[in-house]
Amino acid sequence: SDIAKDKAARLLKKRGSISSLGSHDVKPRGSFSKTKDSVSTVSYIDEPGHHDDIQRPAILVENTYQMGPTKRFPVASVNNILKDVLTSYLQEEKYEAELCRQMTKTISEVIKARVKDLMIPRYKIIVLIYIGQLNDQGMRVGSRCIWDPANDTFSSYSFKNSSLFALANVYGVYYE
């Protein structure tokens, strides 16, 4: 017990912390415990009134006055990423509902990571993946967005094999 107190005191001195080592005379409430001493530590405490009188200066950050992107969203590069990822992940796959559900999550994360690797500053990246069974049916997918047509854009790629289809959309929305 004394060894534990000494060790705790040394650690507290090194860290500059406050300890309630003086509470060793507090006995446990129940008779089921054989421990006689109590050791508790606080790694950091702010003394009351210490910082209350000091006003910290506000951090001022200057505006960049940048109203448009320095680098445009590379639609062609993103389109190549979409083609590459969809083809590599789905070329030999057969449609299975549970597998395709997991594949949409995986493919969207891979595409998002690869688009982020292009390091396009100040663009939010949104990736949507649709995978369905190819069974002589039709489907229309539409999207509507409120955005700035001068800076915001998208890239889209559709893929088919013998049993499934996939559509990948990547939206690049400029964030000021």
Swiss-Prot record:
One of its GO terms (molecular function) is dynein intermediate chain binding. GO terms for biological process: microtubule-based movement. InterPro entries: Tctex-1-like, Tctex-1-like_sf. One of its GO terms (cellular component) is cytoplasm. It holds the Pfam family Tctex-1. CDD domains: DLC-like_TCTEX1D1. Belongs to the dynein light chain Tctex-type family. This is Dynein light chain Tctex-type 5-B. It comes from Xenopus laevis.
